[in-house]
């Protein structure tokens, strides 16, 4: 059946940057109208950090846009529930491994939900797919891509795979020449990696053709992705830090085992730095998602993450979050102005969404999102709408402001922002102010919003902001030169 929505033609215009080829390319799924996507998920031994949040939100945004275009998306994100770090943490805590992993799986789901992320269609756990991992290892050994060491470990022989390094653009000979890696006794090459680890006392273990043991990390994703999506699928994603060695090793394992291309497109989310430095527990700049959401509204965190292109490197700081909070507030304020003038609460339905995408500004939004999921440019389109709403409201053009507000909220729903009732969001802001959590930048942002409200003759909102700030101990002084403030 032919699609008749404004997005009917847009489906074929999507381009995605492929990390393997190093260029943007037209997206052509294996099956018409369907997308299989696998994203490397979390190793569940601790609370998720802000880098995990970027992966969660980035691929949630991609899934939502693919679905908006009309694709039937099968989104798979695995859970690594057996790993050295998990074993170590459980031992440190004196906790059963299953209890530890379930606790952090639950926390991960809570964080993802708070950030407005859809649940994956499938969420395979490594420990549920040991058989598939063993079968893939057996195939690799049989075809001379892997070998068993005398110590009971099984290794992948990187020399056996001619294309090793094609994703990360690394040459194996150059890597070996510059390597300071000491060759383990049972390895033929220092870059050979473990597929099966021989059992150690007091560690989880499974019976295998090579003795008791457990799988290596890399084979887990190869086996689970193939089980859920087949030998070849459309999109494989994860954080940029996984490109080498994890994703490189996945390609080597999977393509050697199946003889098929592994993934048609590779997407990698950029790093997050904290105040210009790499996030690290040793530097004391490590923040969990919960740390951040204790200080900022979850929608503010989502907005911050979407405000940069998913592949770009992002600097995380209080000032950046404050700026995102202020920006999001201004978008909500534009909706509030339109609602107050119209005397109605704005509710979006499918017809309004179609109207929004059929508009000129909707076409700009489509163009941005179809350019490798460029949410940053798409958000700039939303700000253009907000400015036009304020202009129309100031001119008392109620119907134009209302139509533009419909477009704003309808387009924003694809990014899953601006979907709260306006008053609910503003009440949450009041709660933040009451807790005296505002930085100088946040106060300045509210003062700018108050000035905008006055310009648009929305004196009720201007007074509301003054009261909010007063309750937080902030005194305002208005003069012809502008507004100054001080903490009482």
From Swiss-Prot:
<feature type="binding site">
    <location>
        <position position="246"/>
    </location>
    <ligand>
        <name>Zn(2+)</name>
    </ligand>
</feature>
<keyword id="KW-0862">Zinc</keyword>
<feature type="short sequence motif" description="'KMSKS' region">
    <location>
        <begin position="278"/>
        <end position="282"/>
    </location>
</feature>
<dbReference type="InterPro" id="IPR032678">
    <property type="entry name" value="tRNA-synt_1_cat_dom"/>
</dbReference>
<feature type="binding site">
    <location>
        <position position="281"/>
    </location>
    <ligand>
        <name>ATP</name>
    </ligand>
</feature>
<keyword id="KW-0648">Protein biosynthesis</keyword>
<keyword id="KW-0436">Ligase</keyword>
<protein>
    <recommendedName>
        <fullName>Cysteine--tRNA ligase</fullName>
        <ecNumber>6.1.1.16</ecNumber>
    </recommendedName>
</protein>
<feature type="binding site">
    <location>
        <position position="40"/>
    </location>
    <ligand>
        <name>Zn(2+)</name>
    </ligand>
</feature>
<dbReference type="Pfam" id="PF23493">
    <property type="entry name" value="CysS_C"/>
</dbReference>
<dbReference type="GO" id="GO:0004817">
    <property type="term" value="F:cysteine-tRNA ligase activity"/>
</dbReference>
<comment type="subunit">
    <text>Monomer.</text>
</comment>
<feature type="binding site">
    <location>
        <position position="221"/>
    </location>
    <ligand>
        <name>Zn(2+)</name>
    </ligand>
</feature>
<dbReference type="InterPro" id="IPR009080">
    <property type="entry name" value="tRNAsynth_Ia_anticodon-bd"/>
</dbReference>
<dbReference type="GO" id="GO:0008270">
    <property type="term" value="F:zinc ion binding"/>
</dbReference>
<keyword id="KW-0030">Aminoacyl-tRNA synthetase</keyword>
<keyword id="KW-0479">Metal-binding</keyword>
<dbReference type="GO" id="GO:0005829">
    <property type="term" value="C:cytosol"/>
</dbReference>
<dbReference type="Pfam" id="PF09190">
    <property type="entry name" value="DALR_2"/>
</dbReference>
<dbReference type="InterPro" id="IPR014729">
    <property type="entry name" value="Rossmann-like_a/b/a_fold"/>
</dbReference>
<feature type="short sequence motif" description="'HIGH' region">
    <location>
        <begin position="42"/>
        <end position="52"/>
    </location>
</feature>
<dbReference type="InterPro" id="IPR015273">
    <property type="entry name" value="Cys-tRNA-synt_Ia_DALR"/>
</dbReference>
<keyword id="KW-0963">Cytoplasm</keyword>
<dbReference type="GO" id="GO:0006423">
    <property type="term" value="P:cysteinyl-tRNA aminoacylation"/>
</dbReference>
<dbReference type="GO" id="GO:0005524">
    <property type="term" value="F:ATP binding"/>
</dbReference>
<keyword id="KW-0547">Nucleotide-binding</keyword>
<dbReference type="InterPro" id="IPR056411">
    <property type="entry name" value="CysS_C"/>
</dbReference>
<feature type="binding site">
    <location>
        <position position="250"/>
    </location>
    <ligand>
        <name>Zn(2+)</name>
    </ligand>
</feature>
<keyword id="KW-0067">ATP-binding</keyword>
<comment type="similarity">
    <text>Belongs to the class-I aminoacyl-tRNA synthetase family.</text>
</comment>
<dbReference type="Pfam" id="PF01406">
    <property type="entry name" value="tRNA-synt_1e"/>
</dbReference>
<dbReference type="InterPro" id="IPR024909">
    <property type="entry name" value="Cys-tRNA/MSH_ligase"/>
</dbReference>
<dbReference type="InterPro" id="IPR015803">
    <property type="entry name" value="Cys-tRNA-ligase"/>
</dbReference>
